[in-house]
Regions:
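Membrane-proximal structural modules of membrane-associated proteins and complexes
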Residues: 3-120
Length: 120
């Protein structure tokens, strides 16, 4: 399943979320591709939102990167792969992880949005 933005040539080739062997740890993988004849470098940011259930309350929280920011910068020509993990407190159920892709010159409007549910 590919979702993309034909104007920019960017598309999500693969986006998955899995619970690891470690309780409360989830791993996600995202592969972005850029098509076209001679694509120029894509520069932008990714933002992730985690939808979870904790103590019978639904919450949506931003995923924070290693630099303590919500923006995960990307800069690539043809292919970009990101594989990271995050932890949640005990008694928390992850319902989904959403990624939004923004171009550098427009941080208000995402060019692509896709959601992944945890796979067993």
């Amino acid at each position: 399943l590919m979702s993309g933005n034909t104007k920019s040539g960017i598309s999500i080739y693969q986006f998955s979320l899995k619970e690891t062997q470690t309780p409360g740890e989830y791993r996600y993988a995202l592969t972005l591709v850029q098509g076209g004849e001679r694509p120029s470098d894509f520069k932008g940011n990714l933002r992730f939102q985690v939808r979870l259930l904790q103590h019978d309350q639904r919450k949506t929280i931003p995923l924070i990167g290693k630099n303590s920011k919500q923006d995960f910068p990307v800069n690539f020509k043809f292919l970009h792969r990101l594989e990271e993990s995050f932890n949640v407190p005990p008694n928390t159920t992850i319902e989904s992880l959403q990624v939004k892709i923004y171009e550098n010159n427009n941080s208000k409007k995402a060019i692509i949005t896709q959601t992944a549910q945890p796979m067993p």
